[in-house]
Amino acid sequence: MNFATKVSLLLLAIAVIVIVEGGEGDSWFEEHEESDTERDFPLSKEYESCVRPRKCKPPLKCNKAQICVDPNKGW
């Protein structure tokens, strides 16, 4: 076998390994992917979403994004 043949076979073997491992990696990611509900944790009950005219607990106010925020802190 000459050098070019050895290099070609080595690259082919690497490509096969990458393809096989890549498929397993995708399935692992899909199994362990977080859903939207798992990622969106509320800060606390005081800072929950508010749909107007629902009122927030004092001193919090409902902002444009419909979230109860402290007007003194701005968040």
Swiss-Prot record:
Disulfide bond sites: C50-C62, C56-C68
Subcellular location: Secreted
One GO CC term on file: extracellular region
Chief location bin: secreted
Impact upon substituting W75A: Does not induce the full openings seen with the wild-type toxin
Protein name, entry field: Phi-liotoxin-Lw1a
Expression across tissues: Expressed by the venom gland.
Keywords: Calcium channel impairing toxin, Disulfide bond, Ion channel impairing toxin, Ryanodine-sensitive calcium-release channel impairing toxin, Secreted, Signal, Toxin
The UniProt record lists the keyword Secreted: yes
Signal peptide extent: 1-25
Extra remark: May reach its physiological target by traversing membranes, which may be by slow permeation. Alternatively, scorpion venoms are known to contain amphipathic helical peptides that form pores in the cell membrane, and it is possible that these pores would allow Phi-liotoxin-Lw1a to enter the cell. Negative results: has no significant effects on sodium (Nav), potassium (Kv) and calcium (Cav) currents.
Organism: Hormurus waigiensis
Role according to the record: Affects the activity of both ryanodine-sensitive calcium-release channels RyR1 and RyR2 with high potency. At lower concentrations the toxin increases full openings of the RyRs, and at higher concentrations it inhibits full openings and induce openings to subconductance levels and reduces the number of full conductance openings. The different actions may be attributed to the toxins binding at different sites on the RyRs, with binding at a high-affinity site mediating the increase in full openings and the induction of subconductance states evoked upon binding to a lower-affinity site.
Comment on protein domains: Structure of this peptide is made of two-stranded beta-sheets (or DDH for disulfide-directed beta-hairpin) that is uncommon for a scorpion-venom peptide, since it does not contain the CSalpha/beta, CSalpha/alpha, or knottin motif common to other disulfide-rich scorpion toxins. This structure may be the evolutionary precursor to the knottin motif.
Propeptide residue interval(s): 26-39
Ranges that cross the membrane: none
Record bears the keyword Nucleus: no
GO molecular function, one term: calcium channel regulator activity
Upper classification of the organism: Eukaryota, Metazoa, Ecdysozoa, Arthropoda, Chelicerata
